[in-house]
Amino acid sequence: MFSRTLHVYLKINFYFCGLNTLQTIDMDKKVITFGEIMLRLATPDYLRFCQSDKLNATFGGGEANVAVSLANYGIATEFVTRLPKNDIARACVMDLRKYGVGTSHIVYGGDRLGIYFLETGAVARASKVVYDRAHSAISEIQPG
């Protein structure tokens, strides 16, 4: 069982404070992450993009992944982002909730969810990632 605090090494570079240290997280507090979550389309079985006629769909993004990981340790988390109002975004929110991540501060607007394509490397071949993030809902968010 967890003690009232949990020591977690968070290697996250927040643009506003440069946090990159060993932190003590009070289990009674909530960790809030803010960032872009994207649709991840990955080739199966270590195939290259040109070899596969299928792509597996999941969701991912640095800050969302941190929220899910912390939620797995029993730490209350909330993910803040902007998503388009469509079925794919709803599936994304349902996926976060499945892992116990709070989604009550997600705002809706914009036309599209960012996408990234992953070709998982094999042996000496490195993985490849292709991003399609232009004009995503969060990239076009305005103050207010």
Pin down the residues of each PLM region:
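Ala/Thr-enriched low-complexity intrinsically disordered regions
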Residues: 5, 21-24
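Glycine-rich phosphate/adenosyl-contacting loop at the front of the ribokinase-like
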Residues: 25-102, 124, 136-143
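Beta-strand->loop->alpha-helix junctions that form or flank phosphate-binding loops
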Residues: 84, 104-113
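Short beta-strand scaffold segments in enzyme catalytic cores
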Residues: 115-119
